[in-house]
UniProtKB/Swiss-Prot annotation:
Matches recorded under NCBIfam families: PRK05309.1, uS11_bact
Gene behind this protein: rpsK
Assembly, per entry: Part of the 30S ribosomal subunit. Interacts with proteins S7 and S18. Binds to IF-3.
Gene3D superfamilies in the record: Ribosomal protein S11
Function: Located on the platform of the 30S subunit, it bridges several disparate RNA helices of the 16S rRNA. Forms part of the Shine-Dalgarno cleft in the 70S ribosome.
GO biological process: translation
Top-level division of the source organism's lineage: Bacteria
HAMAP family assigned to the protein according to its UniProt record, in alphabetical order: Ribosomal_uS11 (MF_01310)
The name this protein goes by in its record: Small ribosomal subunit protein uS11
């Protein structure tokens, strides 16, 4: 019986000119997802996925590294321009945006989409350290 050769499908490079970078920056982590204009994910990265543990995940440097990794996957797919949406109060917001620009992507717009409650749920009690 003839042996089947191990053939693997090659990843098809999508040629997407522009997209949206969603930066979710919390107090504990920063997640960067790059999508096309419809919202289909092209690449993502986070501080935790890059090996940062504990309180190091919430640093601006970790956010910068996460944005660089996500930008590389976007550039591989032919992306040149980005809209940036930022959500959350974390430390890595500005660092992630600067890192996307430094990676060679042109940022056309920056939008803050942090959800603000109209006096909804009661916030957690204050920490006493």
């Amino acid at each position: 019986m003839a042996r089947k050769t191990n053939t693997r499908k090659r990843r098809v490079k999508k040629n997407i000119e522009s997209g949206i970078a969603h930066i979710r920056s919390t107090f504990n982590n920063t997640i960067v997802t790059i999508t096309d204009t419809r919202g289909n994910a092209i690449g993502w990265s986070s501080a935790g996925a890059l090996g940062f543990k504990g309180s190091k995940k919430s640093t601006p440097f970790a956010a910068q590294m996460a944005a660089e990794t996500a930008a590389k996957s976007a550039i591989e797919n032919g992306m040149k321009t980005l809209e940036v949406t930022v959500k959350g109060p974390g430390a890595g917001r500005e660092a992630a945006i600067r890192s996307l620009q430094a990676a060679g992507l042109e940022v056309t717009a920056i939008v803050d989409v942090t959800p603000v409650p109209h006096n909804g749920c009661r916030p957690p009690k204050r920490r006493r350290v």
